Amino acid sequence: MASLRKTHPLLKIANDALIDLPAPSNISIWWNSGSLLGLCLIIQILTGLFLSMHYTPDTTTAFSSVAHICRDVNYGWLIRNMHANGASFFFICIYFHIGRGLYYGSYLYKETXNVGVILLLLVMMTAFVGYVLPWGQMSFWGATVITNLLSAVPYIGNSLVQWLWGGFSVDNATLTRFFAFLFLLPFIIAAMTMIHLIFLHETGSTNPVGLNSNAEKIPFHPYYSFKDLLGFIMLLTILVSLALFSPNLLGDPDNLHPANPLVTPPHIKPEWYFLFAYAILRSIPNKLGGVLALLFSILVLLLMPILHTSKLRTLTFRPLTQFLFWLLIADVAVLTWIGGMPVEHPFIIIGQIASALYFTIFLVLFPTAGLLENKMLT
């Protein structure tokens, strides 16, 4: 008689996705980041659920309700620190995941990769609205600056901003709707993740050498389930250590002050994981141009399948493009540094050069190097 997990209508789906799934035998630790993202999403939904039980989405009490969670709620400080730092780890895993996808040519599974880019945009949106909720100085001014970018939309911009704010400035209506969005978005992300996985399981995973691995597959469980478990333990160890020993390390000290519309912080900047995009936004003097560059810095990932010119899928045997890939990583690191710096002389020009290089690598150098390597192969 067949096992229940292979016959039951619901268990069968889980079995085909997590237990009997045929997986390539040679995928490395870089393929762990997907399941780590799943773990991060679960951590964020659970900690967020418990935080929402004690939080009040009102401008007069939001800041003090967060203080109340940390002081008076049983283990509230731990839940809050796990949630705040969990967001940082979510983005660390996302950037590893995207980097893996670029390096090993995973983007050639177009449907999976397109859903992945939509997921990235959703997660960025969620992180932004979540950062506004504690109603500290940087929450308020970050919300004001970023929502104001919509005013760059021709003709309807100003109406759009006021419609989003629910008034003439970031105020109680804005905070309330952002709390509603923050409750809704993670469940949309969870649904999109399912679609992401459905598309992935249509084709199967890539592997480090970029060849078809149908000839040699191994079951996901026990091999990769245990490999993923190692990743889970490592992630949780680092996350809990950070939440216990240095919970404010990645945050902005300005956010420890309650929001004050009359006092502008000296340097308005987002959380560290948005700094590269913020630097690209700031490097263009024109408002609409900056907003478009900001959008395109993420949407350029959608063009990767079109810009893939090489006969080889992965970068494992492509030294030229490998160099460009690591140049891109270094460039994003420079942009992240510039995004946190004040807008003054050396930083402005460095940011503009780094932004130009970012788009040049994606749109010009990657395709050119691919064609050159094809010539070298023939």
From Swiss-Prot:
Belongs to the cytochrome b family. Its cofactor is heme b. The gene is mt-cyb. SUPFAM superfamilies: a domain/subunit of cytochrome bc1 complex (Ubiquinol-cytochrome c reductase), Transmembrane di-heme cytochromes. This is Cytochrome b. It comes from the Eukaryota. Heme b b562 binds at residue 83. Heme 1 (or BL or b562) is low-potential and absorbs at about 562 nm, and heme 2 (or BH or b566) is high-potential and absorbs at about 566 nm.
